[in-house]
Structure formats: structure tokens, C-alpha cells
UniProtKB/Swiss-Prot annotation:
Binds to 23S rRNA. One of the proteins that surrounds the polypeptide exit tunnel on the outside of the ribosome. The keyword Iron does not apply. One of its GO terms (molecular function) is structural constituent of ribosome. InterPro entries: Nucleotide-bd_a/b_plait_sf, Ribosomal_uL23, Ribosomal_uL23-like, Ribosomal_uL23/eL15/eS24_sf, Ribosomal_uL23_CS. Keywords: Ribonucleoprotein, Ribosomal protein, RNA-binding, rRNA-binding. It holds the Pfam family Ribosomal_L23. This is Large ribosomal subunit protein uL23. HAMAP family: Ribosomal_uL23_A (MF_01369_A), Ribosomal_uL23_B (MF_01369_B). It comes from Thermococcus sibiricus (strain DSM 12597 / MM 739).
Length: 86
């Protein structure tokens, strides 16, 4: 899949912002057909970071939400600031 089509939008909620600050995780709504390797590759390509792991949840609305944990040498706060979450 095209990395720019995998990530639909970032999630901007209190929980998502607290995860950025405390756990070095970013939260995105992603394409329903995307797999964990697709999401990892897309985040690494689009935001120029290294991903540690990806967790996926299908929401009650039918959207696929991805929790992306970054490697310790990268800051989720800096990436969030670049994409306009803060």
C-alpha cells in the first residue's frame, strides 16, 4: 500500500495527547486494509522516525486505530508538533 494512503488522520483526544507525553506513542486512524507492517512502514516513511511497535484496535465506529510506539531515540512530542497536534 502507498504510505500516504495508509494514514488517514491523527487522533486528537486527551488520551492520545497524554500517550504522546507519557508513553512516546502516536495515535492514527488508518485504512481498514492496512496491516501492522504497512502502518510501521508508512509512519517511518512519512514522519522520518523509527517505530518500535504497532498496536491496532477496530473502534465501535468501524475505524481502524493504530497506536504507534516510537524508538526511544525519537520523540513523539516533536513529531506531534510537526503535524500540528500541539
Amino acid at each position: 500500500m502507498d504510505p500516504y494512503k495508509v494514514i488517514v488522520r491523527p487522533v486528537v483526544t486527551e488520551k492520545a495527547i497524554s500517550m504522546v507525553e507519557r508513553e512516546n506513542k502516536l495515535t492514527f486512524i488508518v485504512d481498514k486494509r492496512a496491516t501492522k507492517p504497512d502502518i510501521k512502514k508508512a509512519v517511518e516513511t512519512v514522519y522520518e522516525v523509527k517505530v518500535d511497535k504497532v498496536n491496532i484496535v477496530i473502534t465501535m465506529k468501524g475505524e481502524k486505530k493504530a497506536y504507534v510506539k516510537l524508538k526511544p531515540e525519537y520523540s513523539a512530542s516533536e513529531v506531534a508538533a510537526r503535524i500540528g497536534l500541539f
